[in-house]
A protein has these predicted regions:
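NAD(P)+-binding Rossmann beta1-loop-alpha1 motif at the extreme N-terminus of oxidoreductases
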Residues: 1-49
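Structural beta-sheet core signal
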Residues: 5, 27, 74-76, 104, ...
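Glycine-rich, N-terminal phosphate-binding loop of Rossmann-like dinucleotide-binding domains
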Residues: 8, 53-55, 220
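Rossmann-like NAD(P)(H) cofactor-binding subdomain of soluble oxidoreductases
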Residues: 12-16, 41-117, 132-136
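Internal alpha-helical scaffold of NAD(P)-dependent oxidoreductase catalytic cores
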Residues: 47, 65, 92-101, 119-205
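A general structural signal for well-ordered alpha-helical segments in protein cores
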Residues: 59, 86-90, 132, 163, ...
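General beta-strand structural signal in soluble alpha/beta enzymes
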Residues: 76, 101-106, 145-149, 207-208, ...
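NAD(P)-dependent Rossmann-like dehydrogenase/reductase catalytic/cofactor-binding core
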Residues: 168, 197-201, 205-207, 211, ...
Length: 296
């Protein structure tokens, strides 16, 4: 048995570090890295289990160009919605891979703390519960892995929480206080659940690790890339400058736009996601947040 992590950014490297503790594991990325067990993409794709951390907006093209269906089992560790076709990641992967061979990782985790071996809990989500259990067994003891079959619920939570995290960063950047941020995050959870239930997600997913757990973490910590985007927006910095200085992908930016488009098409009420998109497009941040906090 062998595992290959695809993508050697901070998140991919952290997962490689964790999986390597008890398993034979290699890592690969588009750009060669000076790290142990780094292999070419061709070698990585020969492994039995793949862990994909490819940015959401690049996933469809990457699969078209690189993936040869050899029956591998895949754990998708990215989060977001493709803005080109408004598809969730599970829908994109299912165009190329049998759903029985797919699992999706969710839950409140930061790469930095995984590298420090600090305890955490996460969820392996799959329509194939035997596969979910298999991937859960790969994690070291300080990473408690649960399983779920609510793939769409996990996908909605993983994407949506990044949008609320931008709003949380804006709220803190404006100095509105802990009360305001807590109100915004709580209402964000309700909005996220409303959006997810439209697509058939289970209620309990939003109250667990994939939903409330990941949302509360991501929307209130400086370790969150999307939260830091919000801080920059509150300081009236240009979005391009914020993203360049970040040096990593902040999926919430594209996800806010995708959610707004989907919500308009489906008639779903998503005031926070809509206002985040407006602020990303240049609307005055103080007026936007004031409007959100004043809604009934």
């Amino acid at each position: 048995m062998s595992i290959a992590v695809i993508g050697a950014g901070k998140w991919g490297s952290a997962l490689f570090y964790a999986f390597s503790e008890n398993n034979e594991c290699v890592i690969s990325s588009r750009t060669p890295r000076e790290m142990s067990n780094f292999v070419s993409l061709e070698e990585a794709l020969e492994c039995e289990y793949l862990v994909c951390t490819i940015p959401t907006q690049a996933t469809n093209l990457w699969l078209k160009q690189n993936y040869k269906n050899k029956g591998q089992k895949i754990l998708v560790a990215s989060k977001g919605i493709d803005t080109a076709n408004l598809k969730f990641l599970n829908e994109i992967y299912e165009d190329f891979v049998d759903s029985e061979n797919l699992a999706f990782l969710s839950g409140p985790t930061f790469a930095k703390e995984i590298m420090q071996k600090l305890p955490c809990a996460l969820v392996a989500n799959s329509k194939n519960q035997n596969l979910a259990l298999k991937f859960a067994s790969f994690f070291p003891s300080y990473m408690k892995a649960y399983t779920s079959d609510d793939v769409i619920g996990a996908e909605v939570c993983g994407a949506y929480k990044n949008v609320i995290a931008i709003a949380g960063g804006i709220c803190d950047g404006l100095g509105l206080g802990n009360n305001a941020r807590a109100s915004l995050i709580s209402r964000g959870l309700v909005e996220m659940a409303r959006f997810g239930k439209f697509f058939g997600a289970k209620d309990e997913t939003f109250m667990g690790l994939s939903g409330a757990g990941d949302l509360f973490l991501t929307a209130s910590s400086i370790l969150s890339r999307n939260y830091r985007v919000g801080l920059g927006i509150a300081r009236h910095e240009r979005l391009e400058k914020i993203l360049n200085e970040l040096g990593e992908v902040a999926e919430g930016v594209d996800t806010a736009r995708a959610i707004s488009k989907i919500a308009k098409e489906k008639g779903i009420y998503v005031p926070i996601a809509s206002e985040v998109e407006n602020m990303l497009n240049g609307k005055d941040v103080f007026e936007s947040v004031k409007s959100l906090l004043g809604r009934r």
